[in-house]
């Protein structure tokens, strides 16, 4: 991806908005901006996950012109293809890395306060709650998985569209990536505790 970006930035029609959104989410991280509501979370996702996903889809879809520029000619704008898949994967990612992030720093927890408070949890106590196997952690994770469902469904509808538009190698790479998250998601639907406790190892297993 880094190699591809090096040879496309400045010679492509990739919109500036993805970089602006990415910068905005990074600024929130640096400032330690509190995330109160689910709407705050979705706004943060615009930069934290939708923007990188949009760049990835651009790299998969862009065509190289005779003038040695890259052009995006898909039927819809990038965010149409990226948004639902990105948010769905990001929610799974949050649960997968919950223990690691909670131990490292409360600032790494990008779960809105309203979800934490509804389950009698907080960022500052999340690490100890995980260590003590507080049942509220499972309730929180199940809540997140339920909220991921519409993004999963809509995202896979869009993925079907992408499979009819991308080249063989490009759609193979995309489906392999999404497939890893699909396996983690299905596992979480059956028993989210397994994903919480073994997320990193499970991802490595599913990637092989």
Which residue ranges define each predicted feature?
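Catalytic cores of Mg2+-dependent Asp-rich isoprenoid enzymes
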Residues: 1-88, 100-208
């Amino acid at each position: 991806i880094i190699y591809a970006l090096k040879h496309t930035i400045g010679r492509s029609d990739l919109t500036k908005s993805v970089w602006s959104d990415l910068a905005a989410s990074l600024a929130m991280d640096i400032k330690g901006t509190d995330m109160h509501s689910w709407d705050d979370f979705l706004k943060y996702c615009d930069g934290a996950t939708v923007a990188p996903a949009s760049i990835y889809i651009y790299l998969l879809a862009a065509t190289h012109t005779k003038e040695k520029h890259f052009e995006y000619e898909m039927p819809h704008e990038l965010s149409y293809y990226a948004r639902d898949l990105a948010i769905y994967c990001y929610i799974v990612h949050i649960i997968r890395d919950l223990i690691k992030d909670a131990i490292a720093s409360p600032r790494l927890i990008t779960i809105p306060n309203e979800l934490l408070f509804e389950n009698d949890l907080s960022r500052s106590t999340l690490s100890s709650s995980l260590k003590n196997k507080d049942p509220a952690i499972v309730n929180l994770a199940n809540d997140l998985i339920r909220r991921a469902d519409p993004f999963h469904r809509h995202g896979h509808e869009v993925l079907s569209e992408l499979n009819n538009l991308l080249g063989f190698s490009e759609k193979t790479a995309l489906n392999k990536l999404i497939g890893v998250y699909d396996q983690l998601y299905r596992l979480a639907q059956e028993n989210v505790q397994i994903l919480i406790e073994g997320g990193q190892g499970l991802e490595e297993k599913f990637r092989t």
